[in-house]
Amino acid sequence: MSNYLINIIGPTAIGKTSLSIKVARHFITEIISADSRQFFKEMKIGTAVPDKDELAAATHHFIQHISIADAYSVGDFEKDAILKLKELFNKHKVAVMVGGSGLYIKAITEGLDDFPKVDPEIRRNLNQHLEEDGIDWLQKKLYVLDPEYYKTADVMNPHRLIRALEICIETGKPFSSFLNQKKPERNFKNITIGLMADREMIYDRINKRVDLMIRNGLIEEARELYPQKELNALNTVGYKELFSFFDGKTDLETAISEIKKNTRRFAKRQLTWFRKDPEIKWFEFDENSKNIFDYIESKINT
């Protein structure tokens, strides 16, 4: 009998958390969170961590389980999540995974690509360029060395940019050429549900979510984390814009506007990534849950 991993994906603020809980409750199973920023204990409001009622409605894994000071890569997540899934599949026929990061979803559904080791000096040089020349320098460099990967990369994330660039520089080959190599086999089948809406609706939901975060205390949360702003985990939309405000580089109104703008850009990149996957079954964000359950059951019973 096959095991099934039900993946709930889509752009930020589309309603993935709510649907994942409904699916988990319907199939009496548990949820793997693949949202890399919700891993961190100290980042709650700005990452839209499920609230107490949502966490109580279904068992979640990989929510606020590490500190922002911890080194935790997508490779670490792959190993930990696969072990957790083995445990879950001993109890359940299906499990649910939810998230908006295509890379973290792919790490579990397909496995990570095998990248060569990189000379640490290359990474140091790239970090120095980031410090002295800013993220724009990294973006332009990646566009030149690997325009194909640039199309879908999270170009506002310097950690991801540096990772791609160091592979390009070390090997002389595009980072994208190492993607989609033969992966380890998985002992489960994937059923992937994508939530979508028109652009205006997505942007409206994002703007309202940011306003809610501000009302719920995001500014205070960011202020507490400000002394640690150099940590990679905090180079995240919702925090870095407020850090600029605390630094006196901008006013609060502009910072909040930048959070909304950068979140909208992030949603656009998420959709660009996911739309390449023909295996995703797309539903409108307000689709009747029963129709989604029926689709999942039809795939399981095929």
Swiss-Prot record:
The gene is miaA. GO terms for molecular function: ATP binding; tRNA dimethylallyltransferase activity. Belongs to the IPP transferase family. It holds the Pfam family IPPT. Catalyzes the transfer of a dimethylallyl group onto the adenine at position 37 in tRNAs that read codons beginning with uridine, leading to the formation of N6-(dimethylallyl)adenosine (i(6)A). It comes from the Bacteria. GO terms for biological process: tRNA modification. Its EC number is 2.5.1.75. HAMAP family: IPP_trans (MF_00185). Keywords: ATP-binding, Magnesium, Nucleotide-binding, Transferase, tRNA processing. The record marks S101, R123 as: Interaction with substrate tRNA. ATP binds at G10, P11, T12, A13, I14, G15, K16, T17. Substrate binds at T12, A13, I14, G15, K16, T17. Its cofactor is Mg(2+). Gene3D superfamilies: 1.10.20.140, P-loop containing nucleotide triphosphate hydrolases. Residues 35-38 are annotated as: Interaction with substrate tRNA. It catalyses: adenosine(37) in tRNA + dimethylallyl diphosphate = N(6)-dimethylallyladenosine(37) in tRNA + diphosphate. Monomer. SUPFAM superfamilies: P-loop containing nucleoside triphosphate hydrolases. This is tRNA dimethylallyltransferase. InterPro entries: Dimethylallyltransferase (IPR039657), IPT (IPR018022), P-loop_NTPase (IPR027417).
